[in-house]
């Protein structure tokens, strides 16, 4: 998958590279997410990270695709903003330290195989503190029976999966989503979470 993303970012315009995402913009504009120390988990070419920097956030962006980080740094320079872009693996972080007030994941966790999602959580939790907010977007819909036989088709979140994985650590609010099998993707969901009590790893 890493080679796929590097080739896509280096030679093409990724179809998901569509600028700052609507839910993020709305949360910032309405003040639900306030300028703070933020990290974009799987930042791609940096659209969301750059938007946050333009709105007063102290931003770190992380992606394991070197080609994406190269483009992100160039775009931040063109936008005349400062973002700390880092090449790192979200299932085995080595170059990110400290905690963040706001964490953002648009389409990374749902792109991980099922066996990679627990390592993601173990690496993400130490980046939070009590009160940290986490915005998570991903494909979410009940898999149809035949999809279980399609290779690499364990991508979508299953209903209840986010609550099961994150509920012990976060208060969870589902702020957007739909399921419609006549469209692609058949379903998606956006969650805004707040880290509970005293943060524990």
Identify the residue ranges that each predicted region occupies.
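Class I (Rossmann-like) S-adenosyl-L-methionine-dependent methyltransferase catalytic domain
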Residues: 1-39, 45-95, 112-123, 127, ...
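A short acidic, Gly/Pro-enriched loop at the edge of an enzyme's catalytic core
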Residues: 95-103
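Short catalytic micro-motifs in class I SAM-dependent methyltransferases
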Residues: 107-111
